[in-house]
Design a protein with these regions (language model features):
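C-terminal non-catalytic interaction modules
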Residues: 1-23, 207-266
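Long, contiguous interaction/recruitment modules in multidomain scaffold/adaptor proteins
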Residues: 1-13, 20, 47, 54, ...
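Amphipathic alpha-helical segments of tetratricopeptide repeats
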Residues: 14-15, 45, 49-59, 92-103, ...
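Structural signature of alpha-solenoid helical repeat junctions
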Residues: 23, 30, 59-66, 103-110, ...
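Aromatic-anchored, glycine/proline-accented short structural segments
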Residues: 133-200
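Glycine/small-residue-rich hydrophobic helix-like segments
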Residues: 174, 178-232
Length: 266
């Protein structure tokens, strides 16, 4: 496993674009995660295609785990651009791939990624009770050391609470995510947690939420996290009416040029 790729995907250097050539299924998956965080969706999907080819047949638990992770990662790319119903197909496949495997940290991590993904997919199509049930199942599987899955559980919990208009509950989950991400070493997870807290704060003090979101936006731009920069920009512009530089429309265009096709509102 490449330390550099790990640092870009889940560490302190998410802005790095000169990545080493992957040599293993794990490093190909990490490369996809790193590229997706930068909004380089076409390249990220190509990396996931390699994971799919190398895990075809899914003979060992290791292969099935990374086949599952690849499917849930592909789902996250779809979801980030608004394609929740399609993402649910990938997340469902991700969960099915590891179904029946003996519990282990890696199997539980993959299952939790699929479950939180399915919950977020349910949110996107307005099925909030289903989302909460899926998160409850995920919570039962999260074990010691699964920091990333613990943060994702808080993220989607905050998002479901926001969708139901419960800003107090949303802020509680967002605060939990901020606390968990503070020591994890992943800039991307910390920035997204901060952004969710800003979103939850809009129910209490919209001006302060927009001000804090600007700091988050600046971090996103500094570290090349374009999808999160776009989300930050949308929040700022929606709450304050003042555009960011670059604005959400420009970021939308850049992400589209990198292979991210946003779903048009129906």
């Amino acid at each position: 496993m490449s330390t550099t790729v790990q640092s870009v995907a889940f560490g302190a250097e998410p802005q790095l674009v000169l990545l080493p050539v992957p040599a293993s299924v794990e490093s190909w998956w990490l490369t996809a995660v790193a590229l997706g965080g930068q909004g380089r969706y076409a390249q990220a999907r190509a990396a996931l295609d390699v994971v799919d080819r190398r895990t075809a047949g899914q003979v060992t638990d290791h292969e099935r785990t990374f086949a599952s992770l690849a499917a849930s990662t592909r789902a996250s790319f779809r979801r980030q651009t608004g394609w929740h119903a399609q993402a649910a197909l990938d997340d469902g496949r991700a969960l099915a791939i590891v179904a029946g495997l003996d519990p282990s940290p890696s199997v539980d991590a993959a299952a939790c990624d699929a479950l939180t993904g399915l919950a977020a997919d349910a949110l996107g199509v307005g099925r909030l009770p289903l989302g909460w049930r899926l998160l409850a199942e995920c919570g039962e599987r999260i074990g010691e050391g699964l920091w990333r899955q613990s943060i994702r559980l808080e993220w989607v919990s905050a998002e479901l609470a926001l969708a139901s208009g419960d800003f107090t509950r949303a802020l509680r989950h967002a605060d939990n995510a901020v606390e968990l991400s503070g020591d994890c070493g992943s800039v991307r997870h910390k920035v997204k947690s901060d952004l969710l807290r800003c979103a939850a704060m809009t129910g209490f003090d919209a001006n302060e939420a927009a001000q804090r979101a600007r700091a988050v936006f600046d971090q996103c731009m500094e570290f090349g996290l374009l999808p999160l920069a776009w989300a930050s920009s949308m929040l700022i512009e929606g709450v304050s009416g003042v555009a960011t530089t670059p604005n959400s429309s420009v970021l939308d265009t850049v992400i589209a040029l990198r292979g991210g096709v946003f779903r048009s509102p129906s």
